């Protein structure tokens, strides 16, 4: 049985397209008797809760296993110890015993030495986690983290209040990882794995060692690196028989400015593609550009798996223009507000509902206010129920300036929503047939996009026809049987 290990820096509940793609791929793999494991490298004390939420929300299959570097070595350390190490907790208790507590509220307290008056401890509680900042000469020197009353981490600071090191503790209170932090750039430096008596010069070496311990080097094991920042860690391992692939989920070109410049992480992957078994992209157009620019042979096209939703009755009667994405520059949301302005000028009954969060939220809020669109353009934040929100829309728009595939557009088409999108690399032109199952608009043509929105919302029959054909297209293009066969063929090469 093939075992795949899909590698990414982290998992969380409110993650977007790439996480969704990995979780869906894992489920399809498992349905086809291929293990679909996930591998992460970040530190989260509450990963158990995160995985439960992902499973409860149906985003993650309950059969999917996740292996995390810290959890892996913590569990190993737990097996070596049976008695609790109370050294640090006793020290903290003694410090608090000889002090005066002044409460700011139920969650925050400060402790002062009852004789010298020195400021000793700042304590704050956040749900199940309690954090203690320890002070000497009025400067923070350590931060202790407790989760359900168990010490799990200590941060160490210098006299400038800069983080210099992190210590990680197992369930019995024993140190299992110590790592130094470069104060000038925040990079992880020397890392020490206590029970294995191992020293690593940097985080890449440490994570590569974790992969080597986790994944047996045989022909049945396959590593699939989805997170571009995690690629150097996979590349560093000494595996000879286990296969290695990298998936590029986005446009590899930089700043969508047509300069030909390539993003640093994606460029590193492509320049080192000869050292792995292959690079996978989501569209044929991207594959052709990469072959042309990098003279590569081992680049393959396999689209993301799509959850084929059940066929349901059309409800395209709403005057709601929908958009689901992160609020980041590459999504072209300033153009979307310009489109909204022109549409609302013609029909004040039309509303734009934008779901998602991100760094541009304040900028978009200000733009909405400046253009006096508060009654018609709603920023509704992150939703964990995208399907139900899309069902409310009369049509869906995309002003994105760069795409890897466009999962939210695909989901909208599956739900029979007419889609109007800027024609950008890569994605929309792979599945939108202009005037047949949606509309492809020349990039940044605000006037034309506005006209098409008004046309679709005014002519419900047209909107329903586009929606029906859109669903047919997606089901034909993204058939799971076709895609799983591509993966299986790749594993055999």
For each feature predicted by the language model, list its residue ranges:
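Carbohydrate-associated surface elements
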Residues: 250, 285, 305
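A short, active-site helix/loop in glycosyltransferases that binds the activated sugar's phosphate group
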Residues: 273-298
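A short, well-ordered alpha-helix in the C-terminal region of glycosyltransferases
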Residues: 369, 389, 448, 455, ...
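Aromatic "clamp/platform" in nucleotide-sugar-dependent glycosyltransferases that forms part
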Residues: 382, 401
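A short alpha->beta transition loop at the rim of the catalytic pocket in nucleotide-sugar-dependent
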Residues: 387, 394, 416
